[in-house]
Each structure stands twice: as C-alpha cells, then as structure tokens.
C-alpha cells in the first residue's frame, strides 16, 4: 500500500511540473538565488562547507560518503547520520500517522522532524556539527558579505533583522530544492 502512495505522489508531482505548476511558488529568480546559497562554502563556520558538500550533485544530491555518518564543517566532528538526497523532497508530506498503513509517513530528515523545505533548509546552517553557525545573526552577517546579497535584496527587500534575513535564505533554498534541477522527473517511469 505504501508503494502505491509513493507512486501516486510521484505521478502527481510530474503532472504539476508538466503543467507548469512547480511545487514551490517563487520562480526562477528565487531558484537561482537558492542555488547560489546551496553551493556557497562561505556560509559555514569555519568556511569551506556548503549544502552541496553533503548533498552532491554527482550523487543525486545525496552524501558522497558511503558510510553511516559524515564529517561536518569542523574537522573531527561527525553528524549523527549520513545525508539523504534532497531530490524530490519537495513532494514529501508533513509527518503524520497513516491509519490505513498503521505507520508514520512523511517529514523531512531521516526521522521526519522537519515539516517543510524552508524549515529543513535552516537546520544544517545552525547545527554545530554540520555548518557550525552559532545563530541566525551569524548566518545573516555572512550572507550580507556575499556577492549575491544585492540579488537577495531585489527579490525580498531590505531588512536589518537577522530573523527575516534567515527566513529569506531558507525560502530561497526551499525554492531551489523545489526546482526542476533537483526534481527532474527524468526516469523512464516518469513518462
């Protein structure tokens, strides 16, 4: 029964994409900004780690490491789990109990703790092992120093508030994770 639900979700997603209705509103400007953020190694502490470090394009946006855990931005510190692929994460439902299957379904991360792409996008940025930033203010300061900060302001508007800027960052990351680049539906079964 679970397989049927997953197939239905994939089919519905491909219908949405083919009709020109992406799963995330925002269009190509936000997606392009999100891609820059996703690949920016200056957003970690210390710098050198990006979202793409653990979600490698060459591995289907999954962890390049084939072991159960991966090293984060700080040398010698390891995450609790290997990074899962972000492909098709835009179509994962919020965590809920399915009475018919008598099991929990959905949610992002291995344990389903995150209800949305925007929420999920912020977790690694503030995780002391993954990207090592202490707080949203630290992330905001780094984003303000990037060459694409002007583009972010054009899309979202100016803000001096770290919480708002962090929300803009996670929204752009969610837009990129909802893009056709990450959700291509190119399998022969997607036709």
What residue spans do the PLM features occupy?
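Sec-dependent N-terminal signal peptides
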Residues: 5-14
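Periplasmic c-type cytochrome electron-transfer domains
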Residues: 19-191
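N-terminal secretory signal peptides that target proteins for export/translocation
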Residues: 1-3
């Amino acid at each position: 029964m679970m397989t049927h639900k997953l197939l239905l979700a994939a089919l519905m997603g491909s219908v949405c994409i083919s009709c020109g209705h992406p799963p995330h509103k925002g269009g190509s400007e936000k997606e392009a900004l999100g891609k820059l953020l996703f690949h920016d190694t200056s957003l970690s502490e210390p710098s050198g780690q990006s979202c793409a470090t653990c979600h490698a394009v060459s591995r289907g946006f999954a962890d390049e490491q084939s072991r159960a855990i991966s090293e984060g931005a700080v040398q010698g510190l390891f995450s609790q789990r290997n990074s899962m692929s972000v492909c098709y994460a835009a179509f994962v439902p919020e965590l809920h109990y399915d009475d018919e299957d008598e099991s929990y379904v959905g949610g992002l991360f291995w344990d389903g703790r995150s209800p949305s792409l925007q929420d999920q996008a912020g977790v690694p940025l503030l995780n002391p092992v993954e990207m090592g930033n202490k707080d949203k203010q630290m992330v905001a300061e780094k984003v303000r120093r990037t060459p694409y900060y002007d583009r972010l302001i054009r899309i979202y508007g100016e803000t001096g508030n770290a919480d708002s800027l962090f929300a803009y960052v996670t929204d752009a990351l969610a837009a990129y994770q909802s893009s056709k680049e990450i959700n291509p539906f190119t399998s022969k079964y997607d036709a």
